[in-house]
Amino acid sequence: MSICYYDTVGREKRLLIINQRALALPNRTISSDGTCCDGDEYLLVDTFTKLNFKVQTIRNASKIVLETTVRNYIEKNVKRVACYFVVVLNDGNDADTILTTDGTYSLSELYALFTLYTVRAIPKVFLIQSCLGAKIDRSHCDRASCQCDQEEDAHPTSVCHDIFVNTVRRVIHACSRKSNGSTTTTETKCSDVATVVLTSPHTEETIIVYLRIEAYLRYGDTKCGCFMIEKFCKNLIKYGTRSSVHTTITMVQNEMQITDPKHVPIVQMNCTKLLFLGDENHIIMEEY
């Protein structure tokens, strides 16, 4: 394995899906099977299972259940872990919080759980899909058990990128810890709205992919899920076993820019290596 890649061969790859979407529905109505037409969750489980991930899902949790689950996910047999993936499916909340049955849980608190010394060097990928709005787009829903109203209306509009600035600051503050007294400061352009100064140690090894959509609680097709999750899973299968996850994310941004330019996810990377999910003998990227 090249020194340019994290050592993941023979180690356990983990995915945690935090699905709080039903909590944002009117009167919290959900389908009779409790899944609330969530193609995203189905697609994520199927995709990551094919990539030999150990998949865990938590739905509609309280704050204490959410935090306890995440802690156990992080700390169990940590020496065997190759990488952590966390997908948050979360609607109807403020930009920097996760809706729970008893209030909200901040994303900063979630990220801070991964600052333990024992997991700092392990690559961590967070995929945050969040929507905020009164309308529910069920135009593609084909689940007979769904009790949600369908509204076919204008295309949803994404929130202005400046909403993310304070969120990113809090995220980086939570994840930033001095490592041997040394930190690196960089400036990253957050769209064309503002410049955020990011201070983070070399050892955090974190990727955050964040997309927020306003106007709709948007789930999309029950088989495909929302656009970002669908494209992420498709490209992860296509590129994740042949090159790096970084390439996968770039391809998602590329496709979103072409097909849905208002909803290109914001990506924050703080990595010293590339994350590769396939057999080391199949790496086709150029060695440095």
UniProtKB/Swiss-Prot annotation:
Q: What is its EC number?
A: 3.4.22.-
- What is the annotated signal peptide range for this record? none
Q: What class of enzyme is it?
A: hydrolase
- Please give the InterPro entries that the UniProt record associates with this protein: Caspase-like_dom_sf, Pept_C14_caspase, Pept_C14_p20, Pept_C14A
| Residues the record marks as active site | 131
Mention one GO biological process in which this protein takes part, according to its record.
proteolysis
Q: Which UniProt keywords apply?
A: Apoptosis, Hydrolase, Protease, Thiol protease
Return the SUPFAM superfamilies for the record: Caspase-like
Gene3D superfamilies in alphabetical order: 3.40.50.1460
Q: Protease as a keyword?
A: yes
Q: Known Pfam families for this protein?
A: Peptidase_C14
Q: What induces it?
A: Synthesized 9 hours after infection of cells ex vivo.
Output the Gene Ontology terms for molecular function.
cysteine-type endopeptidase activity
What the protein does comes down to: May induce host cell apoptosis and contribute of the establishment of a special cell cleavage process in which apoppotic bodies are rescued by the virus and differentiate to form large vesicles in which virion assembles.
By sequence similarity, the record places it as follows: Belongs to the peptidase C14A family.
The name this protein goes by in its record: Executioner caspase
- Native organism is Spodoptera frugiperda ascovirus 1a (SfAV-1a)
